[in-house]
């Protein structure tokens, strides 16, 4: 009975060593699991960005309103006979806003 017990104990030690330190053991599983979580977070950010870009493409393909809005905001374009007014905040309000942004 002693040899069987010794054999089973040796088998148990070998299995535990393989589980903890061997190839595809607990340490490898933990590392791969961390990599998967990080990749899923990156994928979620990229999916949100892609969804935003697809929505913008749909807006631009959908009609003239989106193109007109983009031209007005980004290029400061106006229609013929239209006057463009830019409202500039007071210097004190600009200083307050700059102070809040620096915090």
From Swiss-Prot:
Membrane topology, Cytoplasmic segments: 1-3
Q: Which PANTHER family match?
A: CELL DIVISION PROTEIN FTSB (PTHR37485:SF1)
What does the UniProt function comment say about this protein? Essential cell division protein. May link together the upstream cell division proteins, which are predominantly cytoplasmic, with the downstream cell division proteins, which are predominantly periplasmic.
- The residues forming a coiled coil are 33-62
Q: What's the protein called, per UniProt?
A: Cell division protein FtsB
| Disulfide bridges in this chain | none
All ranges on the Periplasmic side of the membrane: 22-103
Give the main localization category: membrane
> Which Pfam families does the record match to this protein?
DivIC
Looking at the UniProt entry, the stretches that span the membrane are: 4-21
Q: Which organism is it from?
A: Salmonella arizonae (strain ATCC BAA-731 / CDC346-86 / RSK2980)
Subcellular localization is given as:
Cell inner membrane
| GO CC field | cell division site; cell septum; plasma membrane
NCBIfam families cross-referenced by the UniProt entry: PRK00888.1
Transferase: present as a keyword of the record? no
Per the UniProt entry, what is one GO biological process? FtsZ-dependent cytokinesis
Tell me where on the tree of life, at the top rank, the source sits: Bacteria
Would the keyword Cytoplasm be found if you checked this record's keyword annotation? no
Its subunit composition reads: Part of a complex composed of FtsB, FtsL and FtsQ.
Keywords of the record: Cell cycle, Cell division, Cell inner membrane, Cell membrane, Coiled coil, Membrane, Transmembrane, Transmembrane helix
């Amino acid at each position: 009975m002693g040899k069987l017990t010794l054999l089973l104990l040796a088998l148990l030690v070998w299995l535990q060593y393989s589980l903890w330190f061997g190839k595809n053991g607990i340490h490898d599983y933990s590392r791969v699991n961390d990599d998967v979580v990080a990749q899923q977070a990156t994928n979620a950010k990229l999916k949100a960005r892609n969804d935003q870009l697809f929505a913008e493409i749909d807006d631009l393909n959908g009609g003239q309103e989106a193109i007109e809005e983009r031209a007005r905001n980004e290029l400061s374009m106006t229609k013929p006979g239209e006057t463009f007014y830019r409202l500039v905040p007071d210097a004190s309000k600009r200083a307050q806003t700059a102070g809040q942004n620096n915090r």
